[in-house]
Structure formats: structure tokens, C-alpha cells
Amino acid sequence: MDNQSKHLIDIVEYVDNQKPKVKKNIEIVKADPDYPYMLHGSVNGNIKEFVPRLAERPGPKEDKTVPRVHVSDSVIGCVEGMNELVWYLMYGYNAYGSNEKVDFKNGWYIYKLPFEYCLKPNEELVYDMGLSNEHWLVPYNKETKKYKGEIIAKLIVSEVKYQNTGIDDGKRSKVIYEYLLEIMSDKVKITPDNEPYLPGYYKITYFARLGIKTSDNYNPSTYTPEMCQVERISQSEYNGVKKRISPDLFTNLGFIDKLKKSFTW
């Protein structure tokens, strides 16, 4: 039996041992040979290994029984899965309830985690699955008790806008995030619907809440291509923003003195 076949047998057995609700609402996913890893965003740039564990801050109706590493196939998926980066910038690192001692440098490290097989829950187990495309790396055998991680990109927030579009014609207020992304090595999917992007510098404009007229088939819990715009930028433009206080929008809140410094990564 080859190693891949053994992994498949092991993860099938692992799923069979889960609770009925999990078994009914989970899918086994095999790694794509052209993109054999998932992504995980963190303010901690010193993670060597990721250990599957129960969710510490589960969302509404999120599964609380399966130990896992929360991952997604794209940067936007990671952001939707847990937008801790904007939260930290607005309210301070410790306000999020983390006990980790991390030198927060005002940005997110994007890790790649290679895998053979993983699990894909549906909305019954992860309520924001339609936006995050969350996957789980689970401990289904001895080789998957830990997953190795490698930093391949860095993400910073350059601007956040709230735009009131009114209440006529079913419009929704816009929340617009502007991120800058440095892809350092390998290729990275920025959005769930596009091909991976090569190393370089990118500006991401993300309309987290669409300011559009809603229609009968519009689902605010599902990602659509109109929500994201990606533009390649120069290294000098990226560095120019990185050296500023990030972002200026948040510096008047008064209780995030940690942010009053330049980027150091």
C-alpha cells in the first residue's frame, strides 16, 4: 500500500468515528498536486508547527467537537474565517482575548501548510463557510498530529472605509478593506475564484459587505467575484505604506499605543 492510499484509509476511518452531525456535513478533500497546501493567517511569525485543537473562539453554531487547524485555500478566505487583524488594529492585541505573547507588528503572516487530505465542512458546521471556504487539517493518523508551516506571504491593512449607501432599493452599506500583500515565495490564491498569484506585491480592495441592490438570488453569506479587486503594485509603493503607521485611520482611538511605530518585518 502506498503512502497516499494509507492516508485516505486513515482519514475515512477518522470521519467514521465522528459524531453523526459531523459525518453528515463533512467532505474529504485531496490536495491538488498543483497547489498542495492550505493557508493560515496569524500575527505570530514564529510558528513552526500547527497542532489541531478544538476551536477556542467558535462562532455561532460552529462545531465544537473536532480538533483541527483552521485553514483556507485563499487569503480572502483566511480573512473571512477570522478577521483578527482588523480587530487587533482597532482595539489592541490583548482585546481579542488571546493569551499568547506575540510581538504584534501590525500585520499578518500567511503560512502555507502542506497536506495529503483534509476535511471541508459545510454551513451546518461552520456558519460562514460560504465566505471563508474553511477547511480543517485534522489529526487522523500519527503523521498528522502536527502540521509544518512556512511563511510565504505578509498582509497589512492600509485602509478601512464604511460607506453609507442608503436604504432605498434594498441597498446595503459598504464596508471596504484595502490590504497590501507581499508574496515572498511560491504561489498564493488571493481570492477563492482566481488562479494563484506569483511572488510580488499586490493591493487588494475587498468589499466585505456589498453596497448593491439585493436581488432574490443574492446571498450575503456567499463570496462573489465582485467583492474583491486585485492590482499588482511596485515594491516601492508597498514599502511606502509599510513604513507608515498602519493605518492612520485607527491612531485616534487612544488605546492602541502599540501601533505607533513603523513596520519592522
Question: Where do the protein language model's features map onto the residues?
Answer:
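NAD-dependent ADP-ribosyltransferases
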Residues: 2-265
